[in-house]
From Swiss-Prot:
GO molecular function: ATP binding; UDP-N-acetylmuramate-L-alanine ligase activity
Source species taxonomy: Bacteria, Pseudomonadati, Pseudomonadota, Gammaproteobacteria, Pasteurellales
Subcellular location(s) per record: Cytoplasm
EC number from the UniProt entry: 6.3.2.8
Protein family according to the UniProt entry: Belongs to the MurCDEF family.
InterPro entries the record matches: Mur-like_cat_sf (IPR036565), Mur_ligase_C (IPR004101), Mur_ligase_C_dom_sf (IPR036615), Mur_ligase_cen (IPR013221), Mur_ligase_N (IPR000713), MurCDEF_pg_biosynth (IPR050061), UDP-N-AcMur_Ala_ligase_MurC (IPR005758)
Designated name of the protein: UDP-N-acetylmuramate--L-alanine ligase
Underlying gene: murC
Annotated binding of ATP, by residue: G125, T126, H127, G128, K129, T130, T131
Length: 476
């Protein structure tokens, strides 16, 4: 590790007078990833969060000092304090840092500092950025380029969401939720798509969100590269406003890198990509869905345009095991009513839920799709209510859990009971509302049939509930 740190230090100067870096909200995947990279660079890392989780456990095992709970004393020796977007200005540690004149910065500002002396590749978009970031990271690793990467979710092939490489490459997921991706200064930027989400950040104005994405792309140097999805109407509307080289990809006939002949069998997808030079490249993926073909093609475009050969690209994509909680198969289980498959998925926006359902239908045509859905945030449920009603009506059986608030206060009419009523009124599926999470295993056991594909869907604690199901079924 010492030799690696010395090599990196020759390339990336250390931050002047920074010794101890404290993270408030260190248990988040994005925060923990940056903390892990800095820890491996040799900085003294401390952090706090309200509860232990896999991220805090990993950081502790690597030498980080983790506090459970927030206290002013946690920042006493900090040179700088890094805060996640979930941390409020009145947090006791933030207040204490200001009183001690310790710099307080956003997560993306620290990520930007990591990127400043490296060749940065930033992946943004409403959907698909975590998987695309993981795919690019694995291609560069396969090519022997030893990149640093910081992702918002687990890169299964690497067993972590962050890694400190010894090369000049840094591949990072860019966060639009608080517009903090504007701090980044990459050499290559990918935008997968743009849809209304996190609209409080953009004052409820979708045009403001679109302008912010254009500004993000203008953070590229004049010789930089913007990679944009040709299937996304909003992105294609913005292309004329982007004063940088733009290369597009997608199923659209107008795409520079065009996808053809997509087919899916179970978890496996395969298709062709036609390059601008007319080369036909056959891609094999072991993650399902057309949305993953788009993610993989974005990764291919970046790699091809940066001079990586086809062999490394194809091998990395064929070996790609997925990102954490992205159509994550937890297993097949024998129940009294028959054999079922359980899949855990992070998607929490109507579009994400829709492509997950589509992937399930395409790969397992003869199975019922049973969804356990936990809405995430009252504001998102309110803003996208009709879209949720439409997409959730596409499953065969729907179990609805209460909204996961993520720190928000309830909003009238944006709760799961209201959602259930509207879905029921549409007449396609009769939702089952489960208020008591402890009853979920019993409810699921009552409704499942032989061959069912069960999707545990959402960004809250539904993942823990799905693992409770596994434990229940394994013991039973």
């Amino acid at each position: 590790m010492k030799k690696r740190q010395d090599k990196i230090r020759q390339m990336v100067p250390s931050m002047r007078r920074v010794h101890q870096i404290h993270f408030v909200g260190i248990g988040g995947a994005g925060m923990g990833g940056i903390a892990e990279v800095l820890l491996n660079e040799g900085y003294d890392i401390t952090g706090s969060d309200i509860a232990e989780n896999a991220v805090t456990g990993r950081l502790s095992s690597l030498g980080g000092k983790i506090f459970i709970g927030h206290a002013a004393t946690n920042v006493e020796n900090a040179s700088v304090v890094v805060v996640s977007s979930a941390i409020k200005p009145d947090n006791v540690e933030v207040v204490a840092a200001h009183e001690k004149r310790i710099p307080v910065i956003q997560r993306a500002q620290m990520l930007a500092e990591l990127m400043r002396f490296r060749h940065g590749i930033a992946i943004a978009g409403t959907h698909g950025k975590t998987t695309t970031t993981a795919m690019i990271s694995m291609i560069y690793t396969q090519a022997g380029l030893d990149p640093t990467f910081v992702n918002g979710g687990l890169v299964k092939s690497a067993g972590t969401n962050a890694y400190l490489g010894a090369s000049r490459y840094l591949i990072a997921e860019a966060d639009e939720s608080d517009a903090s991706f504007l701090h980044l200064q990459p050499m290559v930027s990918v935008v997968t798509n743009i849809e209304p989400d996190h609209m409080d950040t953009y004052h409820g104005d979708f045009d403001e969100m679109k302008r912010t994405y254009v500004n993000f792309l203008h953070n590229l140097p004049f010789y930089g590269l913007a990679v944009m999805c040709a299937d996304d109407a909003v992105l294609m509307e913005l292309v004329p406003q982007v004063g940088r080289q733009v290369i597009t990809y997608g199923f659209s006939e107008k795409a520079d890198y065009r996808i053809e002949n997509y087919e899916q069998t179970g978890f496996q997808g395969h298709y062709d990509v036609i390059t601008p030079a007319g080369e036909r490249i056959h891609i094999l993926l072991n993650v399902p869905g057309k949305h993953n073909a788009l993610n993989a093609t974005a990764a291919l475009v970046v790699a091809k345009e940066e001079g990586i050969g086809n062999d490394a690209i194809l091998a990395a994509l064929a070996d790609f095991q997925g990102a954490g909680r992205r159509f994550d198969q937890l297993g097949e289980f024998i129940r009294p009513n028959g054999k079922v498959m359980l899949v855990d998925d992070y998607g929490h926006h109507p579009t994400e839920v829709g492509v997950t359902i589509q992937a399930a239908r395409s790969g397992w045509e003869n199975r019922r799709v049973v969804m356990v859905f936990q809405p995430h945030r009252y504001s998102r449920t309110r803003d996208l209510f009709d879209d949720f009603v439409r997409v959730l009506s596409q499953v065969d059986v729907l179990i609805l859990l209460d909204v996961y608030p993520a720190g928000e206060q309830p909003i009238a009419g944006a709760d799961s009971r209201s959602l259930a009523r509207s879905i029921r009124n549409l007449g396609k599926v009769d939702p089952i509302f489960v208020a008591d999470h402890g009853q979920l295993p019993e409810v699921v056991d009552q409704i499942i049939q032989d061959g069912d594909l069960i999707l545990a869907q959402g960004a809250g604690n539904v993942s823990r509930l799905s693992r409770n199901l596994v434990e229940h079924w394994t013991k039973a």
